[in-house]
């Protein structure tokens, strides 16, 4: 938890002023019982109304001064805690963006969202309460005992006996409840994760008619959470009765022994009332400390989870921003004896991959499900690093490139078409912020998206809803292809990006890419033979290994894996035809 306090370094002034004003407020609060004692001993005893009014005015003044100090403290504590949360959220977001696919896969995107939202909010609230109470509550307890000591040394013994008893009672209850609250937080995280997964996979759940099963699992989880909360709540509910019983015994003792000392003339009636008020102040301060400790416990649990994310080191690190010189005569992309495996996998996903893709070539990649097609093309923009071997772009190892240079050379169309809320123009300018409308329309034309965009009322200024919900699957895919084409990348990667397109549109798309992107090296990952049949070179993957490389006719006649795929989709006559 202490690691996170560095985010308060820009709010040192607020972190000092907030607690300081809380101490000043506490001083005003400690003065109130003495003023009340004077009203009783002087004003009421002597029936001196002017004095009562005067002291009443002092009480009002103390109340207003205390309120002003409390509001000031709250302002500075809120400013510091909000700044803390903003800085922490910014750095965590930056750190998450620095992680490679491997780390994100390992931690889980749902977990990262929870850390960014719920855990940071908990830590932020903890800082706010900490700045307001960590000095005030102990100061009130100590101050009340000192003020009681100044009134009566003998009666202060009651305070010295009761205060530890109160503290121990609160400690005992919290010692039991804090582990309960930690379990509640874990179960709450599980509930949040389950909710997120259910909402994300709602269509799949309905497709398999799993609603009842999911509802039962969710109900069981929330019931377990409810039981845990009830247990913690019942134990926590003992705090107020237990502490008030102890305080009431203390008040009885003060009144009993104080009454005797009043008769003997050692102290006055007002001073006895002041002692009772100080005892109540101690009680409230200790209860506030209990709230503080509870929030610190929650904050600590959240801080541990946040630090766990910060402790994840990116396996793929960026070089400095100095561009590297490339070799214009080298192959555009070259794999040299590459081996790759996922962090949680026991076996390699790719084994001994070697091939060259020259500038301007179209490379088709095909293979069965799980053969490693997406894993292979994810190594080119360095989303993952190879375990062994080299991946070169323009003769330079991808590890030597700054991310900005390497990924600036590559246009990527992922399997899932992802669009962002905003205009079509905004989405098209993701690769090149300075892309003109002409550049965008050219890319839309190649991607077979120009016609439907022109029919939109606002054309390029048409708003796209979150995740492109107001577009069909085919429209989303064509827009993501167009986005990758904006800026004329040196390398274009199409990862099964025509799955939502009909065959006619797919043919027109491949023809347009071939005719209008001369010099661009294109990688087409597809399950369709028709999509890669006319490629200059086809790579056939089988269980992470290259089963064959060549043209369609070469592979059909010399690679059994490729021939089997062909005949599963085409007639023998169609399969034997070239292009």
Predicted regions span which residues?
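ABC-type nucleotide-binding domain
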Residues: 326-579
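Short intracellular "coupling" helices and adjacent cytoplasmic loop segments at the cytosolic face
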Residues: 46, 82, 90-114, 118-120, ...
């Amino acid at each position: 938890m202490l690691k996170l306090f560095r985010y308060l370094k820009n709010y040192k002034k607020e972190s000092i002023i907030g607690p300081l004003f809380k101490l000043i407020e506490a001083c005003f609060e400690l003065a109130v019982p003495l003023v009340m004692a004077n009203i009783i001993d002087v004003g009421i005893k002597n029936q001196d109304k002017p004095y009562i009014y005067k002291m009443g005015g002092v009480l009002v003044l103390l109340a207003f001064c205390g309120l002003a100090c409390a509001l000031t403290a709250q302002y500075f504590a809120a400013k510091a805690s909000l700044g803390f949360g903003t800085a922490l959220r910014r750095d965590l977001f930056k750190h998450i963006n620095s992680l490679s696919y491997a780390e994100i896969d390992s931690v889980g995107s749902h977990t990262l969202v929870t850390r960014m939202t719920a855990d940071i909010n908990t830590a932020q609230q903890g800082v706010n309460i900490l700045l307001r109470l960590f000095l005030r509550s102990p100061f009130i307890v100590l101050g009340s005992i000192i003020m009681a000591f100044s009134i009566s040394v003998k009666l202060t013994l009651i305070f010295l006996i009761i205060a530890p008893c109160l503290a121990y009672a609160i400690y005992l209850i919290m010692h039991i409840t804090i582990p309960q609250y930690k379990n509640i937080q874990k179960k709450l995280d599980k509930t949040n994760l389950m909710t997120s997964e259910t909402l994300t996979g709602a269509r799949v759940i309905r497709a398999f008619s799993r609603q009842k099963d999911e509802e039962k699992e969710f109900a069981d989880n929330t019931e377990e959470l409810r039981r845990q909360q009830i247990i913690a709540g019942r134990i926590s509910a003992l705090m107020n009765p237990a502490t008030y019983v102890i305080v009431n015994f203390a008040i009885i003792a003060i009144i009993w022994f104080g009454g005797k000392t009043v008769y003997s003339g050692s102290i006055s009636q007002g001073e006895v009332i002041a002692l009772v008020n100080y005892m109540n102040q101690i009680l409230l301060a200790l209860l506030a400390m209990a709230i503080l400790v509870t929030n610190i416990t929650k904050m600590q649990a959240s801080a541990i989870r946040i630090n766990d994310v910060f402790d994840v080191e990116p396996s793929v690190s960026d070089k400095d921003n100095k561009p590297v010189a490339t070799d214009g005569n080298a192959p555009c992309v070259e794999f040299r004896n590459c081996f790759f495996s996922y962090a949680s996998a026991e076996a390699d996903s790719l084994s001994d991959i070697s091939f060259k893709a020259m500038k301007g070539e179209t490379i088709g990649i095909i293979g069965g499900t799980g053969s490693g097609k997406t894993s292979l093309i994810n190594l080119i923009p360095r989303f993952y690093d190879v375990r062994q071997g080299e991946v070169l772009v323009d003769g330079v190892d991808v590890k030597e490139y700054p991310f900005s240079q390497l990924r600036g050379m590559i246009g990527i169309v992922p399997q899932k078409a992802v669009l962002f809320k905003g205009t079509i123009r905004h989405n098209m300018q993701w690769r090149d912020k300075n892309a003109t409308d002409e550049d965008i329309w050219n890319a839309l034309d190649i991607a077979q998206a120009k016609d439907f965009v022109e029919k939109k009322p606002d054309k390029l200024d048409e708003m796209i809803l979150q995740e492109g919900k107001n577009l069909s699957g085919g429209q989303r895919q064509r827009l993501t292809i167009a986005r990758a084409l904006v800026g004329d990348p040196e390398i274009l990667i199409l990862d099964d990006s025509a799955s939502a397109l009909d065959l006619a549109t797919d043919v027109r798309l491949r023809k347009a890419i071939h005719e209008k992107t001369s010099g661009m090296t294109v990688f087409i990952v597809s399950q369709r033979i028709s999509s890669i049949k006319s490629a200059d070179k086809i790579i056939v993957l089988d269980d992470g290994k290259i089963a064959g490389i060549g043209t369609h006719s070469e592979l059909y006649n010399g690679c059994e894996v490729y021939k089997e795929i062909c005949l599963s989709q085409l007639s023998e006559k169609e399969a034997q035809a070239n292009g």
